[in-house]
Amino acid sequence: YGVGRITKEQESISGDNYSVLCENGQFVFCLSDGMGSGIEANRESETVVELFEQFLRAGFPRIMAARMINSMLLLQPKEGMFSTFDVASINLYTGVCSFLKGGASPTFLRRDTWVEVVESTSLAAGLVSQTDFDTTTKKLYDGDYLVMMTDGVLDALPGDRTEQMKQLLLEVKNSEPREFARELLER
Protein backbone atom coordinates (compact mmCIF):
# COMPACT_ATOMS: atom_id res chain seq x y z
CA TYR A 1 0.00 0.00 0.00
CA GLY A 2 1.00 3.63 -0.31
CA VAL A 3 -0.02 6.76 1.56
CA GLY A 4 0.22 10.40 0.59
CA ARG A 5 -0.43 13.24 3.04
CA ILE A 6 -0.78 16.97 2.75
CA THR A 7 -2.04 19.63 5.18
CA LYS A 8 -4.16 22.71 4.61
CA GLU A 9 -2.34 25.92 3.86
CA GLN A 10 -1.04 27.57 7.06
CA GLU A 11 -1.64 24.34 9.01
CA SER A 12 1.24 22.29 10.37
CA ILE A 13 -0.93 19.40 11.59
CA SER A 14 -3.52 17.50 9.60
CA GLY A 15 -6.90 16.54 11.06
CA ASP A 16 -6.66 13.21 9.23
CA ASN A 17 -5.36 9.90 10.56
CA TYR A 18 -5.25 6.34 9.33
CA SER A 19 -4.53 2.85 10.57
CA VAL A 20 -3.51 -0.29 8.71
CA LEU A 21 -4.03 -3.75 10.11
CA CYS A 22 -3.15 -7.02 8.40
CA GLU A 23 -4.01 -10.27 10.14
CA ASN A 24 -5.98 -13.46 9.60
CA GLY A 25 -6.03 -12.97 5.83
CA GLN A 26 -7.59 -9.51 6.08
CA PHE A 27 -6.00 -6.19 5.14
CA VAL A 28 -7.96 -3.43 6.89
CA PHE A 29 -7.43 0.26 6.22
CA CYS A 30 -9.20 2.83 8.40
CA LEU A 31 -9.20 6.54 7.52
CA SER A 32 -10.70 9.28 9.69
CA ASP A 33 -11.04 13.04 9.28
CA GLY A 34 -11.61 14.98 12.50
CA MET A 35 -13.92 17.99 12.62
CA GLY A 36 -12.11 21.14 11.48
CA SER A 37 -8.34 21.15 11.17
CA GLY A 38 -5.27 21.31 13.35
CA ILE A 39 -4.41 19.60 16.64
CA GLU A 40 -7.98 19.13 17.94
CA ALA A 41 -9.16 17.53 14.69
CA ASN A 42 -6.02 15.38 14.70
CA ARG A 43 -6.77 14.12 18.22
CA GLU A 44 -10.36 13.27 17.30
CA SER A 45 -9.44 11.27 14.21
CA GLU A 46 -6.50 9.64 16.00
CA THR A 47 -8.87 8.43 18.72
CA VAL A 48 -11.19 6.95 16.10
CA VAL A 49 -8.52 4.98 14.22
CA GLU A 50 -6.77 3.78 17.40
CA LEU A 51 -10.02 2.57 18.97
CA PHE A 52 -11.09 0.89 15.75
CA GLU A 53 -7.81 -1.01 15.55
CA GLN A 54 -8.05 -2.04 19.22
CA PHE A 55 -11.63 -3.26 18.80
CA LEU A 56 -10.66 -5.33 15.74
CA ARG A 57 -7.67 -6.84 17.55
CA ALA A 58 -10.03 -7.75 20.41
CA GLY A 59 -12.23 -9.65 17.95
CA PHE A 60 -15.15 -7.26 17.47
CA PRO A 61 -16.81 -7.18 14.02
CA ARG A 62 -16.15 -3.98 12.04
CA ILE A 63 -19.73 -2.68 12.22
CA MET A 64 -19.89 -3.22 15.99
CA ALA A 65 -16.56 -1.42 16.44
CA ALA A 66 -17.88 1.50 14.39
CA ARG A 67 -21.06 1.69 16.47
CA MET A 68 -19.10 1.64 19.74
CA ILE A 69 -16.86 4.44 18.48
CA ASN A 70 -19.94 6.45 17.50
CA SER A 71 -21.33 6.00 21.03
CA MET A 72 -18.02 7.01 22.58
CA LEU A 73 -17.90 10.21 20.51
CA LEU A 74 -21.46 11.07 21.56
CA LEU A 75 -20.52 10.72 25.24
CA GLN A 76 -17.56 13.09 25.05
CA PRO A 77 -17.96 16.14 27.31
CA LYS A 78 -16.88 18.44 24.48
CA GLU A 79 -19.96 19.17 22.37
CA GLY A 80 -19.71 18.64 18.65
CA MET A 81 -16.92 16.07 18.55
CA PHE A 82 -17.27 14.03 15.38
CA SER A 83 -15.10 12.38 12.76
CA THR A 84 -15.62 10.74 9.42
CA PHE A 85 -15.12 7.01 9.39
CA ASP A 86 -13.92 5.18 6.28
CA VAL A 87 -12.94 1.50 6.30
CA ALA A 88 -11.87 -0.82 3.49
CA SER A 89 -11.33 -4.44 4.49
CA ILE A 90 -9.82 -6.70 1.84
CA ASN A 91 -9.99 -10.48 2.06
CA LEU A 92 -6.52 -11.39 0.79
CA TYR A 93 -7.66 -14.85 -0.35
CA THR A 94 -10.77 -13.88 -2.34
CA GLY A 95 -10.07 -10.25 -3.26
CA VAL A 96 -13.45 -9.16 -1.91
CA CYS A 97 -13.31 -5.69 -0.35
CA SER A 98 -15.92 -4.69 2.23
CA PHE A 99 -16.49 -0.97 2.72
CA LEU A 100 -17.90 0.71 5.81
CA LYS A 101 -18.38 4.47 5.52
CA GLY A 102 -19.66 7.13 7.89
CA GLY A 103 -19.70 10.66 6.51
CA ALA A 104 -16.64 9.83 4.45
CA SER A 105 -15.55 11.13 1.07
CA PRO A 106 -15.92 8.86 -1.95
CA THR A 107 -13.50 5.98 -2.42
CA PHE A 108 -12.25 5.38 -5.94
CA LEU A 109 -11.48 2.02 -7.54
CA ARG A 110 -9.28 2.35 -10.63
CA ARG A 111 -9.18 -0.65 -12.92
CA ASP A 112 -7.38 -0.41 -16.26
CA THR A 113 -9.16 2.37 -18.19
CA TRP A 114 -12.09 3.13 -15.89
CA VAL A 115 -12.79 4.33 -12.35
CA GLU A 116 -15.66 3.26 -10.11
CA VAL A 117 -16.83 5.39 -7.17
CA VAL A 118 -17.97 4.08 -3.77
CA GLU A 119 -19.95 6.84 -2.06
CA SER A 120 -21.49 7.42 1.35
CA THR A 121 -24.66 9.24 2.33
CA SER A 122 -24.41 8.49 6.06
CA LEU A 123 -23.41 10.99 8.72
CA ALA A 124 -20.02 11.18 10.43
CA ALA A 125 -19.51 9.27 13.67
CA GLY A 126 -20.47 11.24 16.77
CA LEU A 127 -23.30 13.31 15.26
CA VAL A 128 -26.35 11.18 16.07
CA SER A 129 -26.93 8.18 18.32
CA GLN A 130 -28.33 5.88 15.63
CA THR A 131 -25.83 6.24 12.82
CA ASP A 132 -26.40 3.83 9.95
CA PHE A 133 -23.03 3.34 8.34
CA ASP A 134 -23.03 2.70 4.60
CA THR A 135 -21.73 -0.74 3.65
CA THR A 136 -21.01 -2.37 0.32
CA THR A 137 -18.62 -4.90 -1.22
CA LYS A 138 -16.58 -4.96 -4.42
CA LYS A 139 -14.36 -7.61 -5.96
CA LEU A 140 -10.77 -6.45 -6.47
CA TYR A 141 -8.40 -7.85 -9.07
CA ASP A 142 -4.65 -7.81 -9.57
CA GLY A 143 -3.62 -4.38 -10.80
CA ASP A 144 -6.56 -2.50 -9.24
CA TYR A 145 -5.94 0.67 -7.25
CA LEU A 146 -8.15 1.44 -4.28
CA VAL A 147 -7.91 5.16 -3.48
CA MET A 148 -9.34 6.51 -0.23
CA MET A 149 -9.17 10.19 0.69
CA THR A 150 -10.62 12.81 2.99
CA ASP A 151 -12.70 15.77 1.84
CA GLY A 152 -9.75 18.18 1.75
CA VAL A 153 -8.33 16.45 -1.32
CA LEU A 154 -11.59 16.69 -3.27
CA ASP A 155 -12.28 20.22 -2.03
CA ALA A 156 -9.08 21.38 -3.74
CA LEU A 157 -10.53 20.45 -7.15
CA PRO A 158 -12.67 22.75 -9.31
CA GLY A 159 -16.05 21.91 -10.86
CA ASP A 160 -17.45 18.40 -10.54
CA ARG A 161 -14.91 17.14 -8.01
CA THR A 162 -15.74 13.46 -8.32
CA GLU A 163 -15.42 13.53 -12.12
CA GLN A 164 -12.21 15.57 -11.85
CA MET A 165 -10.72 12.98 -9.47
CA LYS A 166 -11.72 10.11 -11.76
CA GLN A 167 -9.88 11.82 -14.62
CA LEU A 168 -6.80 12.50 -12.46
CA LEU A 169 -6.69 8.86 -11.36
CA LEU A 170 -6.69 7.71 -14.98
CA GLU A 171 -3.79 10.07 -15.74
CA VAL A 172 -1.49 8.78 -12.97
CA LYS A 173 1.27 6.69 -14.56
CA ASN A 174 3.19 5.35 -11.53
CA SER A 175 2.34 1.77 -10.68
CA GLU A 176 4.07 1.56 -7.28
CA PRO A 177 1.46 2.51 -4.63
CA ARG A 178 3.52 5.11 -2.72
CA GLU A 179 4.55 6.84 -5.94
CA PHE A 180 0.97 6.61 -7.23
CA ALA A 181 -0.25 8.46 -4.11
CA ARG A 182 2.52 11.06 -4.35
CA GLU A 183 1.87 11.72 -8.04
CA LEU A 184 -1.86 12.07 -7.42
CA LEU A 185 -1.34 14.70 -4.70
CA GLU A 186 1.13 16.62 -6.85
CA ARG A 187 -1.50 17.08 -9.55
Label each residue range with its predicted role.
Residues N42-D112, E179, E183-R187:
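Catalytic core of PPM/PP2C metal-dependent serine/threonine phosphatase domains
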Residues S37-A58, L140, D144-R187:
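Active-site-proximal, acidic helix/loop segment immediately C-terminal to a metal-coordinating Asp/Glu
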Residues S12-N24, F85, V117-D160:
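Acidic loop->beta-strand submotif enriched in PP2C/PPM serine/threonine phosphatases
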